[in-house]
């Protein structure tokens, strides 16, 4: 059995655990395979979001779009998008209504839902670690810190909002290398959008992320920020979308697609 087959077995096993109710962030799971953010909307909102993603490709790089009413994806053909993520969020009128590990019963109330699978920066973390760059939330066993920024996304139709960014502390002498490595993955957010000086992004306290967990920033390290696929959730809130389902931040959909597929 080759390494890709082993990784796909690990991904399938992880999705089975999530289907059975296990909840945990997915960073470091099934290394070598792409992970995705998810936003699911009624069909009447799908075109607005597709246009929003097209106008904001670094924050919302779309890897797949489902047919209306479908709960499957070509990214992992045996998976079920209603059950196979570890944790979901349900949104009503732009407000977080609940977090659930299974949304089948809610999905069944809507016949025309369209899911967007959006690239996730967890995908390039394997390459960072192979280069000897510490990925702090993995080494500390927690979720990646994510922050609302003051960077305004290009609006589309009824949708508008600001970019959410993820942060990884990187040793100052490795920042350029980290940017080169991640820049080879434009389909999963690509190169950083900002380095250092978080206040220029409107972030006043790195110890209090809006999503995820704070991580240690050691002497000689610089906070480096990437566009984040939680941006659609900020857009749902800002635009007061009547109904949506999303992944919970850090709790991704693990695909069967190798990371290398998105490497350029």
Curated annotation (Swiss-Prot):
Keywords from the named record: Lyase
Top-level taxon of origin: Bacteria
EC number: 4.2.1.-
InterPro entries per record: D-Glu_cyclase, Putative_hydro-lyase, UPF0317
Gene Ontology molecular function terms on file: lyase activity
Pfam family, one: D-Glu_cyclase
Gene3D superfamilies attached to this UniProt entry: PSTPO5379-like (3.40.1640.10), PSTPO5379-like domain (3.30.2040.10)
PANTHER family: D-GLUTAMATE CYCLASE, MITOCHONDRIAL
NCBIfam families from the UniProt entry: PRK05463.1
Family: Belongs to the D-glutamate cyclase family.
Descriptive protein name: Putative hydro-lyase Psyr_0498
Record organism: Pseudomonas syringae pv. syringae (strain B728a)
């Amino acid at each position: 059995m080759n390494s890709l087959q082993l990784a796909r077995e690990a991904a399938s096993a992880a999705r089975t655990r999530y289907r059975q109710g296990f909840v945990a962030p997915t960073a470091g799971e099934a290394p070598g395979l792409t992970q995705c953010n998810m936003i699911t909307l009624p069909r009447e909102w799908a075109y607005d979001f597709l246009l929003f993603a097209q106008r904001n490709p670094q924050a919302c790089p779309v890897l797949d779009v489902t047919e209306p009413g479908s709960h499957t994806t070509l990214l992992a053909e045996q998976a079920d998008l209603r059950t196979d993520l570890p944790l979901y969020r349900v949104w009503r009128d732009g407000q977080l209504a609940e977090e659930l590990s299974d949304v089948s019963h809610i999905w069944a109330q809507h016949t025309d839902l369209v899911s967007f699978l959006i690239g996730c920066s967890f995908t390039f973390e394997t390459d960072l670690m192979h280069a000897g760059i510490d990925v702090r939330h993995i080494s500390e066993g927690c979720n990646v810190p994510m922050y609302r920024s003051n960077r305004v996304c290009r609006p589309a139709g009824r949708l508008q909002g600001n970019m959410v960014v993820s942060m990884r502390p990187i040793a100052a002498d490795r920042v350029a290398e980290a940017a080169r490595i991640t820049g080879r993955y434009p389909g999963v957010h690509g190169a950083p959008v900002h380095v250092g000086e978080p206040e220029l992004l409107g972030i006043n306290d790195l110890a209090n992320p809006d999503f995820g967990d704070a991580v240690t920033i050691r002497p000689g390290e610089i906070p480096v920020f990437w566009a984040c696929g939680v941006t659609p959730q900020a857009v749902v809130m800002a635009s007061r979308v009547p109904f949506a389902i999303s992944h919970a931040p850090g709790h991704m959909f693990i695909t069967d697609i190798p990371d290398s597929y998105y490497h350029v």
